[in-house]
Amino acid sequence: MRTGVRLAVDPGAARIGVARSDPDGILAIPVETIRRGPGDLDRIAALVLEYEAREVIVGYPASLSGAEGRAARAARAFAKALARRLAPVPVRLVDERLTTVTAELHLRTGASYRKRGARGGRARRSVIDQAAATVLLQNALDTERRTKLPPGELVEGTP
């Protein structure tokens, strides 16, 4: 398995959840939530530099039928823009089906989530966004370890 930090982003309409791996590429760790809009790609680029990430994983919300819907097209467009901004760092699209649901189910059992949830919906959504990015990245790392192949689809225009 390849070593080196990977960064995962789970882009949504309003926010982007971010997670990173440890340097050995074994464990995914939540990082932060970025507000969508001007400067979001710059913030991700800064995180790539800060963590010396070797690759960025972008969540791709394929439908359960496998068809590319509106959200999947938006994720692909975001990944292409990110790939242009981050070149030569590779960007990969990885299936994120049900990551947010999985993240929320895991979080609901934790006391810290309930405490954060008491502060309001915005804080809770921020935690969920980071957790979804963490689930996405952990799934990608586990897939690579199992298959011995990089996960997902390399975004056009990346090395």
From Swiss-Prot:
It is found in: Cytoplasm. GO terms for biological process: rRNA 5'-end processing. Its EC number is 3.1.-.-. It is an enzyme of class 3 (hydrolase). The keyword Secreted does not apply. Pfam families: RuvX. This is Putative pre-16S rRNA nuclease. Keywords: Cytoplasm, Hydrolase, Nuclease, Ribosome biogenesis. GO terms for molecular function: nuclease activity. SMART domains: YqgFc (SM00732). One of its GO terms (cellular component) is cytosol. Its main location: cytoplasm. Belongs to the YqgF nuclease family. InterPro entries: RNaseH-like_sf (IPR012337), YqgF (IPR005227), YqgF/RNaseH-like_dom (IPR006641), YqgF/RNaseH-like_dom_sf (IPR037027). Could be a nuclease involved in processing of the 5'-end of pre-16S rRNA.
